[in-house]
Amino acid sequence: GALVFDAPGPTFRHEAYEAYKEGRAPMPDALRTQMPLLWELGELLGLPVVARGGVEADDVLGATALDACQRQPVLVVTGDKDLLQLLRPGLRVVRARKGVSEFTLYDEEVFRAEYGFPPDRFREYLALVGDAADHVPGVAGVGDKGARKLLETYRGLEEIYADLERHPGALRRKLEDGQPVAELDPDFKDPYALDWSKFIDGRLDAPYDTGVAK
């Protein structure tokens, strides 16, 4: 196991999209002052405590989980829906929905039953619907139902836009207008776009030993 935290400072997403997480309230003082204690707790429990500058905790978590699941079953615990795109054989996700009172355990089958398409299309879904929590726009007017319907048929944005002429007029215009945003978001919302070999060789910017997923 491991505890993964955001490092201080901006990430590559802030450089790519200036309004990323704009308007989000800062961490409450009561929580911020306890962060060093959480790091110490991880060390006392024998858990690697991991953070890396320039990326988010999700990036570290995703890269670590994908590397580890090649050798052993992995369970990711998170409140962030973005990490559902990690789902694959040997990797499940527990998503906290209401603080620590309600959880959903996802595998590929549970995800597909809920969304109607496979997990490897989830970042395309996020590109279409956007993410209000991160102040990231989607394709205006497509919405949740429209995105699900498209991704039941198409494997991703490339296929959707290659087949643009076949979409009904109103939907086609929405997709055309939103294409610049849609084409930004898949990589922008990808939580594991890290080269694992470089990731491990450079170690991680954390104050403790971070030999994760050995």
Map each language-model feature to its residues.
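Non-catalytic nucleic-acid-binding/docking modules located in mid-to-C-terminal regions
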Residues: 2, 45-47, 66, 70, ...
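Noncatalytic, basic helical substrate-engagement surface that gates or grips nucleic-acid strands
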Residues: 1-77, 81-107
